UniProtKB/Swiss-Prot annotation:
Protein name: Activator of 90 kDa heat shock protein ATPase homolog 2
GO molecular function: ATPase activator activity; protein-folding chaperone binding
Keyword Cell inner membrane among record annotations: no
Family of this protein: Belongs to the AHA1 family.
The species this protein was found in: Mus musculus
Cysteine disulfide links: none
Domain of life: Eukaryota
Function in brief: Co-chaperone that stimulates HSP90 ATPase activity.
Protein's gene: Ahsa2
Residue ranges crossing the lipid bilayer per the database entry: none
SUPFAM superfamilies in alphabetical order: Activator of Hsp90 ATPase, Aha1 (SSF103111), Bet v1-like (SSF55961)
InterPro entries on file: Aha1, AHSA1-like_N, ASHA1/2-like_C, START-like_dom_sf
Amino acid sequence: MAKWGQGDPRWIVEEREDGTNVNNWHWTERDATIWSKGKLRELLVGIAMENEAGRCEISELKQVEGEASCNSRKGKLIFFYEWNIKLAWKGTVKESGAKHKGLIEIPSLSEENEINDTEVNVSKKKGDGEILKDLMRTTGTAKVREALGEYLKALKTEFTTGMILPTKAVATQELTLQRKLNENKLQASPVALGVRIPTVALHLTELFDTTVEQLYSIFTVKELVQKFSKSPAVLEAERGGKFQMFDGNISGEYVELVTNRKIIMKWRCRNWPEEHYATVELNFVPAPGQTELQLDCKGVPVCKEENMKFCWQKQHFEEIKGLLELTAQNA
């Protein structure tokens, strides 16, 4: 029998500060299912394609069934994933202005098949519009496969951060270097750094009984923001300008403003991880007697997805509609 401390190093649990999987020998597994669903939604929803005949866009992730995991053994990473994905698409024929909808089905995305061999089926609801279906079958299929490739790349890099740990000697060197860096940071001016966390994307649309100009002003005029939010607001509606709403619970910065057409913002809630911002894009689309507001948001923490939906659907959309009704009554 080996003496204490002289056994096979593969089975010795060294005194590591993190206390996990020394020398990367032991089998560890991490469930990537929830993270993957959010990442697939982020990468697939919003994909757009256009040619001389029309324009199409993937509007919704209708179904994502399956699972994904990553395993670490002897310093190697092994990936397992199997997904059945259904997406909704919509499009407009340029010549006639006719609108059509359809589905995209990916019956088996798994490690057994190469991305270029992954089956992507496109269908369309009854009626004309085959020209849009052809656009989805060609350009659309290629873009979907490209997004699936980005998902696998992120699964193997972004998701696996920290699964392959350094050995004791390397870890000691890195720890010493990190301590020095931390000491330097304390002496230097603070720098706002973002954090990498699992995120999802959201796509919401809402119709408002008002003009594009009026709806745009509700998001850019301080007095109107204070009316629908029923709280003080800080608003600098210009590129690089800051904003703060709902008693400081929401804050951020304007990235781009195109009058009566588009607003892009860096956006965060107070209870999100420090220095983490989502990107929120609002597009104002005129419709007969109404305005359609299209909201696309990327970078929402997975654990805050439902809160984000509530914030926009209840605290923004419903309150703005209430303000518009009150304005119409007092007119």
